[in-house]
Regions:
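Short helix/loop capping segments that flank catalytic or ligand/cofactor-binding pockets
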Residues: 8, 168-169
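Short acidic, glycine/serine/threonine-rich loops at helix termini
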Residues: 8-14, 57-61, 135-137
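A conserved active-site cap/scaffold subdomain adjacent to cofactor or substrate pockets
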Residues: 12-47
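His/Asp/Glu-enriched, well-ordered alpha-helical/loop segment
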Residues: 19, 41, 46, 52-128
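A short acidic, glycine-rich active-site loop
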Residues: 20-30, 67-72, 145-151
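A generic local structural motif
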Residues: 31-35, 109-111, 145-146
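C-terminal cap of metal-dependent C-N hydrolases
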Residues: 62-65, 119-168
Length: 169
């Protein structure tokens, strides 16, 4: 399940902002609510992002000429935390399970765990940090995000992969 389908609806496309031109396309509010319900019930096993960055010039064209795709790595957790966890739609535990153990199972990887003797692969989260999404905050090659200008709560503070800190805010 792509995280943006749990947050946005097809109403966002009315602006013809090329940063909301994505595939699969956004759906109705009723569809979004059905997906949220499926997430709550456990029918959705993992939530991810397809992260499709595009150069600015590719998106600064009329809507119909712009390529499909948006970034998502920098905003996925914060958007879901803000729009699903804080209003009580799903628990933090459910969100974290669907964004970590769920994808690991889907790809046949060992489920993440913190244990002595196990090489660390984890993120440290700042659950209270409120921030505004700006182009300068992106580490990706581009910032073609539907979330530009949005205020979100919660963000990744540190990422440890194979026992090494690979990102730190």
């Amino acid at each position: 399940m792509l995280f943006r389908s749990l947050v946005l609806t097809d109403e966002a496309v009315r602006s013809l902002d090329t940063n909301v031109k994505m595939n699969p396309p956004l759906r109705s509010a009723d569809d979004r609510e059905s997906l949220r319900d499926a997430l709550r019930r456990g029918a959705i096993a993992c939530v991810a992002t397809d992260h499709a960055p595009h150069a600015r010039h590719e998106k600064e064209v009329p809507f119909e000429d712009a390529p499909f795709g948006v970034t998502g790595l920098e905003t996925a957790f914060a958007a879901l935390h803000t729009h699903l966890v804080l209003p009580g739609i799903v628990s933090l535990e459910t969100l974290l399970e669907r964004m970590s153990a769920g994808p690991a199972r889907a790809f046949g990887l060992p489920e993440p765990r913190i244990e002595a003797g196990i090489t660390a692969n984890l993120v440290v989260l700042d659950l209270a940090g409120e921030w505004t999404v700006t182009e300068e905050g992106f580490r990706s090659l581009s910032a073609n995000s539907w979330a530009l200008g949005a205020t979100l709560t919660g963000q990744v503070a540190k990422t440890v992969a194979d026992g090494r800190v690979v990102f730190e805010r």
